[in-house]
From Swiss-Prot:
Non-heme iron-containing dioxygenase that catalyzes the stereo-specific peroxidation of free and esterified polyunsaturated fatty acids generating a spectrum of bioactive lipid mediators. It inserts peroxyl groups at C12 or C15 of arachidonate ((5Z,8Z,11Z,14Z)-eicosatetraenoate) producing both 12-hydroperoxyeicosatetraenoate/12-HPETE and 15-hydroperoxyeicosatetraenoate/15-HPETE. It may then act on 12-HPETE to produce hepoxilins, which may show pro-inflammatory properties. Can also peroxidize linoleate ((9Z,12Z)-octadecadienoate) to 13-hydroperoxyoctadecadienoate. Belongs to the lipoxygenase family. Its cofactor is Fe cation. It is a peripheral membrane protein. It is found in: Cytoplasm, Cytosol; Cell membrane; Lipid droplet. It comes from Pongo abelii (Sumatran orangutan). Residues 115-662 form the Lipoxygenase domain. Fe cation binds at H360, H365, H540, H544, I662. SMART domains: LH2. One of its GO terms (cellular component) is membrane. Binds 1 Fe cation per subunit. Residues 2-114 form the PLAT domain. This is Polyunsaturated fatty acid lipoxygenase ALOX15.
Length: 662
């Protein structure tokens, strides 16, 4: 018995407060006490109560709360509740960070992370089971398109659980920026509707100056071979390039190309030959836009790494050879300038298609969605891995539903301007699923497989490895607090169910691609959880943040190509202009690139979340060390970038978002 001091924290978003009454109960190991005091939670405020409890409750296990309403259910966003018992006892935190709706009773467990094995008396077992049962009703698996990895069920935003929706500041920013982009598009369309574009400089009419210094650099230098090669190392899509171990079988040399073959073999022997192969686009159905057939290629680019770190193209093949036909032409830097430029435009357009669909949408957004749904279905809020990973899952479901209803939907942006639209994008996503290997989501393995370890001019590779290592140590710190032995890992049924749900259900049998169906050791847990967090943070940032820089100048990343790939080398400026997107397609590409690629004013940098899901000093110390290491990496990148002609920013912790939220 004695006096209890209770603090209740309400979120700061616009509608977080409530005019409904909230009643509280304290649940301890030896009893339960209803608190007669009721409160009206105010937005952004902490409310403090002092309540005399007549009986001894023992160690506190839960705070229960119920919001009552007579006429209107006014939802309340509760951050947390803390309780300090009689005397000078420690303050006990009960994290919530969710909306409280309706009249039901919500139980919040004390914030210490606990596995099933950490609860031998079963004090939390009923709560775990009931919470997961309710979550499995809210978070159901859906299948947007047959043959793809699974997604959350629900075709519209209103189908999502309320806790997955944008808070007001995020929603307003997203919708206002979209309206601004579309309004600008309408203005540019009206100004250019009767204009015939004849020169590459005409793309300046839809280029947004002042948005990105690097974008302006791309506009001025996009024709240069050095910038073309640089993008494979450090551009918007740095995950295609690999070091050659042999000359690709598809690279058929027509008569008279013996010198080229010898040059390639020399670079191969020296370990300086690299390739970017877009064979995945072969056979993909090209879009038809307003009755006009669009076109796709499946290029191969062979590049050489020079001693100064520059990556320069040696040859471009735009199509795969076909039986019974002459070998496709090989385009060279020594070809007529327009022929070589057009070949590079085809490569850039192909890279754009694969980047947005495979690297960004599939491997970033949709993979993160699998992690979100599996986590919500399999890990209760008291589980330490849930507490560790939940900050990195914020807003992912809403941004993905918006993508499925606006970008890749029927008559969406892809259908309007992308050469892979009109069904080709779905076909490509299905085929790309075969390349979702476990190792490809883990930079130490992926970079080794692609031969990029030790390439000094690959800043993506260097920064990805450093960020992965920092996240791994963070995960390792939390895992070591809760799993003292490998047996504890094997004996955690919730952890094993979560792993299996991701691999077998969400990823549709990905054990054939190296994903685990069970976790047998602490090292395996650390590796798997690090993969999840890195996918939702660093890897998504590396393929998202470069869009405004590299795609604003449309000729550097054409969303579609209006003429077939060339089979001769007699291209003219007229050929190039007739092939590149028209003004409406280019304007819409610019508008969407700005909206999605701009630096987000409402964002949380990796590791900087305000939510505190763990109680106790040990997890807080692990998080503090994580933040210190992130700050040190950020400073190192800043110092390095100051010496570079083109700074590489996309994996700076201060601009890497904490989740897939845009």
């Amino acid at each position: 018995m004695g006096l209890y001091r209770i603090r209740v924290s309400t979120g700061a978003s616009l509608y977080a407060g409530s005019n409904n009454q909230v009643q509280l109960w304290l649940v301890g190991q030896h009893g339960e006490a209803a608190l007669g005091t009721r409160l009206w939670p105010a937005r952004g405020k902490e409310t403090e109560l002092k309540v005399e409890v007549p009986e001894y409750l023992g160690p506190l296990l839960f705070v229960k709360l119920r919001k009552r309403h007579l006429l209107t259910d006014d939802a309340w966003f509760c951050n947390w509740i803390s309780v300090q018992g009689p005397g000078a006892g420690d303050e006990v935190r009960f994290p919530c960070y969710r909306w409280v709706e309706g009249n039901g009773v919500l139980s919040l467990p004390e914030g210490t992370g606990r596995t099933v094995g950490d609860d031998p008396q079963g004090l939390f077992q009923k709560h775990r089971e009931e919470e997961l049962e309710e979550r499995r009703k809210l978070y159901r698996w859906g299948n947007w398109k047959d043959g793809l990895i699974l997604n959350v069920a629900g075709a519209k935003l209103c189908d999502l659980p309320v806790d997955e929706r944008f808070l007001e500041d995020k929603r307003v920013d997203f919708e206002v920026s979209l309206a601004k982009g579309l309004a600008d598009l309408a203005i540019k369309d009206s100004l250019n509707v009767l204009t015939c574009w004849k020169d590459l400089d005409d793309f300046n009419r839809i280029f947004w100056c002042g948005q990105s210094k690097l974008a302006e650099r791309v506009r001025d230098s996009w024709k240069e071979d050095a910038l073309f090669g640089y993008q494979f190392l450090n551009g918007a899509n740095p995950v295609v390039l690999r070091r050659s171990v042999h000359l690709p079988a598809r690279l058929v040399f027509p008569p008279g190309m013996e010198e080229l073959q010898a040059q390639l073999e020399k670079e191969l022997e020296g370990g300086t030959l690299f390739e970017a192969d877009f064979s995945l686009l072969d056979g993909i159905k090209a879009n038809v836009i307003l009755c006009s057939q669009q076109h796709l290629a499946a290029p191969l680019v062979m590049l050489k790494l020079q001693p100064d770190g520059k990556l320069l193209p040696m040859v471009i093949q735009l199509q795969l050879p076909s039986t019974g036909s002459p070998p496709p032409p090989l385009f060279l830097p020594t070809d007529p300038p327009m022929a070589w430029l057009l070949a590079k435009c085809w490569v850039r357009s192909s890279d754009f298609q694969l980047h947005e669909l495979q690297s960004h949408l599939l491997r970033g957004h949709l993979m993160a969605e699998v992690i979100v749904v599996a986590t919500m279905r399999c890990l209760p809020s008291i589980h330490p891995i849930f507490k560790l990973i939940i900050p990195h899952l914020r807003y992912t479901l809403e941004i993905n539903v918006r993508a499925r209803t606006g970008l890749v939907s029927d008559m969406g942006i892809f259908d309007q301007i992308m050469s892979t639209g009109g069904g080709g994008h779905v076909q490509l996503l299905k085929q790309a699923g075969a390349f979702l290997t476990y190792s490809s989501f883990c930079p130490p393995d992926d970079l080794a497989d692609r031969g990029l370890l030790g390439v000094k001019s690959s800043f993506y590779a260097q920064d990805a490895l450093r960020l992965w290592e920092i996240i791994y140590r963070y995960v390792e710190g939390i895992v070591s607090l809760h799993y003292k032995t490998d047996v504890a890992v094997k004996d955690d049924p919730e952890l094993q169910t979560w792993c299996r749900e991701i691999t077998e259900i969400g990823l549709q049998g990905a054990q054939d691609r190296g994903f685990p169906v069970s976790l047998q050791s602490r090292d395996q847990v650390c590796h798997f959880v690090t993969m999840c967090i890195f996918t939702c943070t660093g890897q998504h940032a590396s393929v998202h943040l470069g869009q405004l820089d590299w795609y604003s100048w449309v000729p550097n990343a054409p969303c579609t190509m209006r003429l077939p790939p060339p089979t001769t080398k007699d291209a003219t400026l007229e050929t190039v202009m007739a092939t590149l997107p028209n003004f409406h397609q280019a304007s819409l590409q610019m508008s969407i690139t700005w909206q999605l690629g701009r630096r987000q004013p409402v964002m949380v940098a990796v590791g900087q979340h305000e939510e505190e899901y763990f109680s106790g000093p040990e997890p807080k110390a692990v998080l503090k060390k994580f933040r210190e290491e992130l700050a040190a990496l950020d400073k190192e990148i800043e110092i390095r970038n100051a010496k570079l002609d083109m700074p590489y920013e996309y994996l700076r912790p201060s601009i890497v978002e904490n989740s897939v939220a845009i």
